[in-house]
Amino acid sequence: MSHNTFGHLFRVTTFGESHGVALGCVVDGCPPGLALEAEDIQAELDRRKPGQSRFTTQRREPDQVKILSGVFSDDRTGGRQLTTGTPIALMIENTDQRSKDYSEIRDSYRPGHADFTYDAKYGIRDYRGGGRSSARETAARVAAGAVARKVIPGITIRAALVQMGPHAIDRANWDWEQVGQNPFFCPDAKAAALYETYLDAIRKDGSSVGAVIEVVAEGVPPGLGAPIYGKLDADLAAAMMSINAVKGVEIGDGFAAAALRGEDNADEMRAGNDGRPRFLANHAGGILGGISSGEPVVVRFAVKPTSSILTPRQSVNRDGAEIDLITKGRHDPCVGIRAVPVAEAMMACVLADHTLRHRGQNGERP
């Protein structure tokens, strides 16, 4: 299997399967001299790890990260552990696998999953928990994202769940402080209360539901990205689309821009006090012509309902026989919830990569 690496200068390769011994990543291209401790990475992993509420999978994984390489400390570093510029290997052990839950479906194709397509492509697949196609892989991305944040300390990246099923938040109630106060990463306290009742009913039905996630990067300087094939928004879209269960991505106003007139959609400018242009709106989501404008970079993506549900569904097995299938095991009733820290990580990795690419071509030119 190829295509397990993304990025150009800040490169991340992830490895591991849902029920394997461990998973992790190798981060190559991280500049030397950055302070990096396991605790920095663990803080991000703890936000994503499973089993923290009844609204996520009850698989209990501590997700303890180990830094295997790429850092060093001695008396000359003042006791600080610093990156060396060499590949940073990060490992997270799997400790709570229940592979027996999947023994009954080893030869069956679960509707909505990658079972059939993996078989069609490779002729062999790890059916335990979805193997490489499991959202468990995203733990490695979150670990890499924690390293990426060290490369872009002046940029603040935050994400939130802004819709669950048909229920969108009231943007007038948006409060970033609320994101850490409820199990949904929701910025609207009233919507979070609704989601609790709504998702409880979904769980009792043995079903699942989708969500919309919004991620915002503030402090992004103008100039990141490149025309045509190196567009910042193209790389962000690819990064978000690579997250499990994501079926649509939009930048700024996205698809809503199609309903606007030109005079409504254009981000008008006036002169700022610092001599730089000041934008009067941000319909473009902080990116124009594939290059950051200095406005907040805004990305949203849609996550489909978790495919593993207790409702019987029609399918076939490897022999072509028609079957009715119920997926057992421990699953997220809304996989979009834990996609929030993953979205932040992918934004961080892309912005770190483009920061290094910009620096490589233009030096430190602001």
From Swiss-Prot:
Alphabetical keyword list: Amino-acid biosynthesis, Aromatic amino acid biosynthesis, FAD, Flavoprotein, FMN, Lyase, NADP
Keyword match Lyase: yes
Residues the entry annotates as binding FMN: 132-134, 244-245, 289, 304-308, 330
CDD domains reported in the protein's UniProt record: Chorismate_synthase (cd07304)
GO cellular component: cytosol
The keyword NADP appears for this protein: yes
Pfam families: Chorismate_synt
Pathway involvement of the protein, from the record: Metabolic intermediate biosynthesis; chorismate biosynthesis; chorismate from D-erythrose 4-phosphate and phosphoenolpyruvate: step 7/7
Cofactors that this protein relies on: FMNH2
E.C. numbers: 4.2.3.5
Functional summary from the UniProt entry: This reaction introduces a second double bond into the aromatic ring system.
Protein name in the entry: Chorismate synthase
Organism: Methylorubrum extorquens (strain CM4 / NCIMB 13688) (Methylobacterium extorquens)
Top-level taxonomy: Bacteria, Pseudomonadati, Pseudomonadota, Alphaproteobacteria, Hyphomicrobiales
Gene: aroC
